[in-house]
């Protein structure tokens, strides 16, 4: 009887750990959103055949731009793609696997798939600069074509943005 309880507890803990480690949409946003949008564009007969899914994905990719285009390149959905792991998308889609799980599998094959990120639009009037990551602070300065020579700490970047804010954010006020 104790062994049965122990097995149940171990299974529960393993399930809880897997849920905690599961990929979130924001961890792999371009992949998840692109896979969802592509899956929603498929009809029921196409969804059942992985070969039709691959053909449809190549057509889908031909009309993509920016981050989605790069995602297609990584998967092998473009003619100029150097590698092809398209079956890692098409077969799970034919099994009705959720986009998050598909992207989790794709990340294991090629980690740069989840490195793709959409550009964040930052409202300088309402955002607390202290809560932003350093890369976002650098992006603000880069968008303004400004640099921060000698900036090492987050506080240095924040100070530089605060100095330049009147010059660049006047249209947003």
UniProtKB/Swiss-Prot annotation:
UniProt entry tagged with the keyword GTP-binding: no
Location (main, coarse): secreted
Signal peptide range: 1-22
InterPro entries: ARMET-like, ARMET_C, ARMET_N, EF_Hand_1_Ca_BS, EF_hand_dom, SAP_dom_sf
GO molecular function: calcium ion binding
Record's keyword terms, sorted: Developmental protein, Disulfide bond, Secreted, Signal
Entry's localization field: Secreted
GO CC annotations, alphabetized: endoplasmic reticulum; extracellular space; synapse
One Pfam family matching this protein: ARMET_C
Disulfide-bonded cysteines: 28-114, 31-103, 61-72, 148-151
GO biological process: dopamine metabolic process; dopaminergic neuron differentiation; neuron cellular homeostasis; neuron projection development; synaptic transmission, dopaminergic
Entry-linked PANTHER family: ARMET-LIKE PROTEIN, MESENCEPHALIC ASTROCYTE-DERIVED NEUROTROPHIC FACTOR HOMOLOG
Family according to the record: Belongs to the ARMET family.
Job of this protein: Required during the maturation of the embryonic nervous system for maintenance of neuronal and cuticular connectivity. Essential for maintenance of dopaminergic neurons and dopamine levels.
Protein's name according to its UniProt entry: Mesencephalic astrocyte-derived neurotrophic factor homolog
Native source organism of the sequence: Drosophila ananassae
